[in-house]
């Protein structure tokens, strides 16, 4: 299965992509959709990962977008490991209540940590309540 990252600016473009794929990551922080539009997109493709990075938006905006996706039936929600604990706790609790699986993710756009560091990161993600751990690193050679 291929997961498509949806980052389009218009609802219509997002909808067209979601209707043509098996699974998608809806980047609400990059799409800038209304809550109602997020809800409608989740109805089209519930088998998606709802993502809204605080670094690209605000905690309040991220909470609003993720809450809408979870309540409407998104299968997964992705929270970055650096998110404030109270934000992560709120989203984790809501996700559990609605049967949504929590992905806690780590990103390193500069390189790849050592294997021991990666194992430690995975453990930390699990202690934060992750159902799934996502680690993204950057290869340099």
Q: Where are these predicted regions, by residue range?
A:
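Conserved N-terminal beta1-alpha1 strand-loop-helix module at the mouth
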Residues: 1-63, 71
């Amino acid at each position: 299965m291929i997961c498509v990252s949806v980052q389009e600016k218009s609802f219509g473009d997002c909808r067209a992509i979601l209707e043509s794929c098996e699974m998608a990551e809806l980047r609400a922080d990059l799409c800038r959709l209304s809550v109602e539009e997020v809800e409608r997109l989740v109805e089209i493709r519930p088998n998606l990962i709802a993502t809204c990075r605080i670094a690209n938006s605000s905690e309040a905006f991220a909470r609003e977008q993720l809450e809408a996706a979870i309540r409407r039936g998104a299968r997964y929600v992705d929270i970055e490991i650096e998110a404030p604990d109270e934000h992560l706790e709120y989203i984790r609790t809501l996700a559990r209540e609605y049967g949504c699986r929590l992905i806690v993710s780590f990103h390193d756009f500069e390189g790849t940590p050592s294997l021991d560091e990666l194992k430690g990161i995975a453990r930390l993600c699990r202690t934060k309540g992750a159902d799934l751990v996502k680690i993204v690193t950057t290869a340099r050679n």
